[in-house]
Regions:
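Acidic/His/Gly-enriched intrinsically disordered linker/tail segments
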Residues: 1-48
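Amphipathic alpha-helical substructures
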Residues: 32-113
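Beta-strand-rich binding/interaction modules
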Residues: 61, 86, 90-93, 106, ...
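Transmembrane beta-strand segments that form the barrel wall of outer-membrane beta-barrel proteins
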Residues: 67, 210-222, 228-236, 240-252, ...
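Outer-membrane beta-barrel initiation region
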Residues: 148-149, 155-163, 170-273, 291, ...
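Residues that define the transmembrane beta-barrel architecture of outer-membrane proteins
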Residues: 210, 224-228, 255-259, 275, ...
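C-terminal outer-membrane beta-barrel translocator/porin domains of Gram-negative envelope proteins
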Residues: 218, 278-289, 300-302, 342-468, ...
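Outer-membrane beta-barrel "beta-signal"
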Residues: 499-504, 525-549
Length: 549
């Protein structure tokens, strides 16, 4: 594990908010702060800044100034007291560090090595002035340090190497930064690249190494059976600009390699409502039926928006994705095994602990079809602990060039979405009978009861509602209308009881009454019971690690 000292922990904790672009100015009033900033991020950020300022000034200058400030009972500003005691510049602390919510980003931009000396350029990304300490490290020991005034413009420095292993800016981590790894350069390599280190499970930053983490993983689906493998990733405790996540696995049932990967690059904007942009490239390859493999490659771009007031819960997302699917041909599916679909998504969310409201608007386009679909969710938690939830879904084909002979693969579905983009965690996505066909994924129509004619190639509208009865038992009801081309519209309904044993991860639905009639008296009632279940440990663990921001 990376070793972090007590004083270093102040900046380490302060950086959590900065890396997620959730931090606020230290000078804001309490009434304008989010809980995480009020209780943790800002106190730690101020503490880290004072510690850094004290180290920079030296000779107990800061301690003496704070003592004088206390004696004056705040009548004389600390900034003025410091100006009388020291000739060193302190405006950077009061005018920038405390008032600018964007963290510093110092970096060693250029490094030229000589026989016994080096020449390097230190830059601050936003041209903000700040003093920094330039260190030489050998055998994990600090052998030289020097404080340097940085005016905001690039600073060129020459110094003796002293046979050091590393040159580093602020090796003690006292100053919070948003990209600390670029503070270090390895002097024993011509390229300056740091050595690679493989570490079991994620950790905090080891600034002397380029880190890759790994740990074992397992998964399950009906066609690959149990899969086991290794997760390899560079994701640290704090968000990084570039992240890569590889999940190579071996399928015991198919006796072949499967898995997925994801790469992400983050662009943070601290001074805009468009506070975050992300570029993704993801891919996966598993089996969607016995001996039938699918591979999906998806480049995407996301833009995230929020109000300037971070206490507001309003959030918006705009995403554009290009899904490319390649499948082994299934004789039971007539459409081409390979296809590409453009998806454009807008998402709006305004939720708190009591009220949840969210909308999703999607447009999909391909050579075969174009469609628009919209969903909105509302959930309210009452003081008694009961909750009421309602969801609306509406979808319409804009064009549809799929012939009737090609089946309903791309159609809307009332009770079991086809998932032709392979986005949902179906355990048995091609099953029509058996336990895996009873898995419920809350998508499209959202019905729990099964109907013989549940797909629509023209339009579909449905409403799903549920209300708490007692603790984890709820009553649900659904109503919907669907229409196929050249056929009359049909209306369906269903109702029943939902047991939320582990909400969103393990739930069971018992149908009661539907368009089929009284469900418990129907033949093979057990086959109509639906369930929500995820076997992925990483997904289940998120139930216990949901962020509080």
């Amino acid at each position: 594990a990376a070793n972090i000292g007590f004083n270093e922990s102040f900046s380490f904790i302060a950086e959590f908010g900065e890396h997620g672009n959730r931090q606020q100015q230290d000078t804001l009033g309490k009434e304008r702060l989010t809980k995480i900033n009020e209780l943790y991020a800002i106190p730690y950020h101020v503490g880290a800044g004072l510690n850094y300022l004290g180290n920079y000034l030296g000779d107990d200058v800061l301690a003496k100034s704070i003592k004088s400030f206390s004696k004056s009972r705040g009548r004389v500003p600390l900034k003025n007291i410091l100006a009388e005691i020291t000739d060193k510049e302190t405006e950077w602390f009061f005018d920038t560090y405390l008032t600018d919510r964007e963290a510093y980003d110092l970096s060693i931009k250029r490094l030229i090595k000589g026989q016994e000396s080096i020449r390097l350029t230190v830059s601050e990304k936003n041209s903000k002035p700040v003093p920094f300490k330039l260190d030489l490290i050998k055998d994990d020991q600090l052998i030289s340090e020097k404080w340097i005034e940085h005016s905001g413009r690039d600073t060129i420095i020459e110094l003796k190497t002293l046979d050091a292993d590393f040159v580093a800016i602020n090796s003690n981590r006292f100053l919070p930064e948003k990209n600390r790894p670029n503070n270090w350069k390895y002097l024993k390599s011509n390229s300056g690249l740091k050595p690679l280190k493989l570490t079991f499970y994620g950790d905090s930053e080891n600034l002397k190494r380029n880190q890759l983490f790994y740990h074992p993983i397992s998964d399950f689906n009906a066609y690959d059976g149990f899969t086991g493998g290794m997760r390899i990733y560079n994701t640290r405790v704090k968000n990084q600009p570039f992240e890569i996540d590889l999940h190579p696995q071996y399928s015991l049932k198919e006796q072949s390699m499967v898995g997925f990967f994801r790469t992400r690059y983050r662009f943070i904007n601290h001074k805009s409502k468009n506070y975050l942009n992300q570029l993704f490239l993801t891919g996966k390859s598993y089996h969607y039926n016995t001996n039938l493999r699918y591979t999906s490659i998806q480049p995407s771009f996301s833009m995230y928006f929020r109000p300037y007031d971070l206490r507001s819960n309003k959030r918006q997302l705009f995403n554009i994705s290009w899904f490319n699917v390649f499948r082994d041909r299934d004789p039971n599916i007539q459409v081409s095994p390979d296809y590409s679909v453009l998806n454009i998504l807008h998402r709006y969310n305004n939720s708190d602990a009591v009220n949840v409201f969210a909308t999703n608007s999607n447009v999909e386009a391909s050579n075969e079809f174009g469609k628009f679909y919209f969903s909105t969710n509302y959930r309210k938690l009452f003081p008694s602990g009961r909750q009421f939830a309602v969801r609306l879904f509406a979808g319409k084909f804009l064009w549809n060039n799929i012939s009737a002979n090609d089946g309903n693969y791309f159609d809307f579905n009332l009770n079991r979405a086809t998932d032709y983009l392979f986005r949902y965690d179906y355990l048995g996505r091609s099953e029509d009978t058996g336990i895996w066909s009873q898995q419920f994924v809350p998508a499209e129509g959202g019905f729990k009861a099964f109907f013989d004619d549940s797909s629509a190639n023209d339009y579909m509208v449905s409403i799903n509602a549920s209300v708490g009865i007692w603790k984890w038992i709820e009553f649900y009801g659904d109503v919907g209308i669907l229409k196929n081309r050249n056929r009359s519209a049909k209306t369906y309904f269903d109702s029943g009881f939902k047991f939320s044993l582990v909400p969103d991860y393990f739930e069971i639905f018992f149908p009661l009454y539907s368009s089929n009639g009284f469900e418990p008296t129907q033949a093979r009632y057990a086959t109509t019971i639906r369930f929500v279940f995820t076997p992925r440990l990483s997904t289940l663990s998120s139930l216990f690690t949901r962020k509080w921001f």
